[in-house]
């Protein structure tokens, strides 16, 4: 286990994974889960005061999925199982050390940097970005 969490936070993680990446499939949802957990364990940049899954998901202006109808409702058994896998420490490239992701417009490449962060890679329609290793040592 990478971080302490409650049953409510397991459900919350499953719901944000669904809301942000349902169209990206199971692997895409797992990668979004990686970003959420990374934000909760990183003690750097704009995540210095983020310590829990709840803090990470509800941090102001971060996850637009919280405004989606997909965020509401009970997560499915599959979605909970995916969230549990992330909580057990399963990481997937390019989200392994990522703190950010976004979906560029259709048929558009990922930017090499996004808010001064380096592109780690792309999965389907999500571009993932890593902080420098010397800045967020908890992630490396």
Positions of the model-derived regions?
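Bacterial extracytoplasmic/cell-wall-associated proteins, especially those involved in peptidoglycan
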Residues: 2-140
